[in-house]
A protein has these predicted regions:
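Cleavable N-terminal export/targeting peptides
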Residues: 1-62, 72-73, 333-338
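Internal hydrophobic scaffold segments of catalytic domains
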Residues: 29-31, 98-99, 107-113
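Outer-membrane pore/translocation modules
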Residues: 38-46, 111-250, 264-265, 269-271, ...
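Short glycine/proline- and aromatic-enriched beta-strand/turn motifs that initiate or cap beta-hairpins
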Residues: 38-72, 76-106
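Transmembrane beta-strand segments of outer-membrane beta-barrel domains in Gram-negative
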Residues: 79-90, 94, 256-310, 314-328
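Residues that cap or initiate secondary-structure elements
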Residues: 91-93, 124, 161, 175, ...
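Generic internal hydrophobic packing segments that stabilize the cores of diverse globular domains
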Residues: 102, 106, 148-152, 330, ...
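Long, compositionally biased, intrinsically disordered segments
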Residues: 103, 107, 187-189, 222, ...
Length: 338
């Protein structure tokens, strides 16, 4: 009885959140008074100085380190350094709400040597777990532990990925005790099929960590613009990790729709599975994701209701809802894209 009451309470919370989402989406194309923020004036006054101070610190720190190891060009060259702070709330039918406070940073030092960069980053792709765990997070990447900080060198590829494979080599250490050395090889390629609207992008990585062993992952992304506001994509992912010794795969079809300059919608249908000779579909789901730039291009809201059909409950439908707020500290960033 108590479990049933708890599930009913959780469902009510999810419905309230979903109602709020539908309300936001319904008014997403209505111009706001300030046109670049949905926050009240008092919140803007609190966030503005804090964001400016943190952004200056991130940018200044990366350029100071880069100038020490590199050249005076560090004061003017573009840098991919950033800090992201996020708060995520996830709910699945039959389970309690799961809260996750995440911090991810990346210090990109572009002038250390020609085509050689010193990279300091938290939570690389190799530490993000299974494809199912990656799917459960709305972020393209997530970082939760200071133990997974990498310090390494990356040799940039010289190729034009539209004409040939662009290859990058990297090596370094994971900052933890005992120190965990790593090496990785990445390749990328972009094709325009028959000079038409379809583009195929391939992104591959082969890695070795002393503690976790070898891993390999590949991503193939076939997409095209449908019109000025819609983009269609078919994405295939596969990964293998020595520590679990199984092949995981995911196939996604998604339609991205730009509502306006600050809002996008994504409609997705996906299947996730594992195994090679005896492959099994572990889950399939339908998801609607709404992403909104709620404040001046550096604070974003994501709301994503989904309907899952997991194998472990005989494909019975299970609702899920994820809410996420994230703030970026970086000079230039555009995270509301198709």
């Amino acid at each position: 009885m108590q479990r049933k009451q708890r599930e009913t309470t959780e469902m009510k919370k999810a419905l309230i959140a979903l109602t709020a989402f539908l309300s936001i989406a319904a008014h997403a194309d209505t111009p706001a008074p300030s046109d670049d923020s949905d926050l009240p004036e008092w919140a803007e006054k609190q966030i503005g100085p804090f964001h400016a101070t943190m952004t200056d610190w991130v940018d200044g720190t990366s350029r100071s380190i880069d100038g020490f190891f590199g050249t005076t060009d560090a004061l003017t060259v573009d840098s991919d350094s950033y800090l992201r702070i996020s708060q995520e709330l996830a709910w699945k039918e039959g389970e309690e709400f799961d809260q996750d406070l995440g911090v991810r940073f990346r210090l990109d030092l572009p002038t250390t040597e020609e085509r050689l960069r010193l990279i300091i980053e938290s939570e690389p792709d190799e530490t993000r777990g299974t494809l199912d765990e990656q799917e459960s997070s709305l972020a393209d990447d997530r970082g939760n532990s200071i133990e997974d900080v990498l310090v390494g060198l990356r040799h940039l590829g010289e190729g034009d990925r539209t004409r040939e494979w662009d290859t990058e080599l990297g090596a370094g250490i994971k900052v933890r005790l005992p120190l965990d050395p790593y090496a990785r090889l990445s390749t990328q390629r972009l094709w325009t099929l028959n000079d038409g609207p379809w583009k195929l992008h391939s992104d591959n990585r082969f890695s070795w960590f002393n503690e976790d062993g070898f891993s390999a992952r590949t991503r193939w992304d076939l997409g095209r613009l449908v019109d000025e506001k819609r983009h269609l994509r078919f994405i295939s992912n596969a990964q293998w990790r020595e520590e679990v010794d199984t092949l995981e795969f995911r196939q996604v079809a998604e339609l991205n729709q730009r509502v306006n300059s600050r809002s996008v919608l994504r409609y997705s249908a996906a299947v996730l599975g594992e195994g090679l000779s005896h492959a099994t579909i572990e889950d399939s789901y339908l998801q609607l994701r709404f992403r909104r730039d709620i404040h001046k291009g550096f604070t974003f809201l994501d709301v994503a209701p989904a309907l899952h059909f997991p194998r472990d409950v005989d494909r019975e439908p299970r609702w899920a809802l994820t809410l996420r707020v994230e703030m970026y500290f970086r000079r230039f960033i555009d995270r509301v894209t198709l």
